[in-house]
Amino acid sequence: MSRKKKKVLVKLVSSAGTGVFWVKQRNPKTQTEKLSFRKYDPKVRKHVQFTEAKIK
């Protein structure tokens, strides 16, 4: 039997509203708050804030 995975996949959605997203892993036991990164959005050609959303 395989071990149960400790990390979950989360979707980081662009705050610019372009529909661009990144997928990251996080450990819910150690990282209890929502993830938020400043990453590059190629549609806007700028670095914008990406915030966590659920993967459907």
Curated annotation (Swiss-Prot):
- Which keywords are on file for this protein? Ribonucleoprotein, Ribosomal protein
The source's domain of life comes to Bacteria
Q: Which GO terms describe its biological process?
A: translation
Q: Does the keyword Ribonucleoprotein apply?
A: yes
Which is one Gene Ontology cellular component term of this protein? large ribosomal subunit
List the GO molecular function terms.
structural constituent of ribosome
UniProt cross-references to Gene3D superfamilies, sorted A to Z: Ribosomal protein L33
Task: Tell me which InterPro entries the record gives.
Answer: Ribosomal_bL33, Ribosomal_bL33_CS, Ribosomal_bL33_sf, Ribosomal_zn-bd
Among HAMAP family, the record links this protein to: Ribosomal_bL33
Task: Describe the family membership recorded for this protein in Swiss-Prot or TrEMBL.
Answer: Belongs to the bacterial ribosomal protein bL33 family.
Q: What name appears for this protein in its UniProt entry?
A: Large ribosomal subunit protein bL33
Q: Which gene encodes it?
A: rpmG
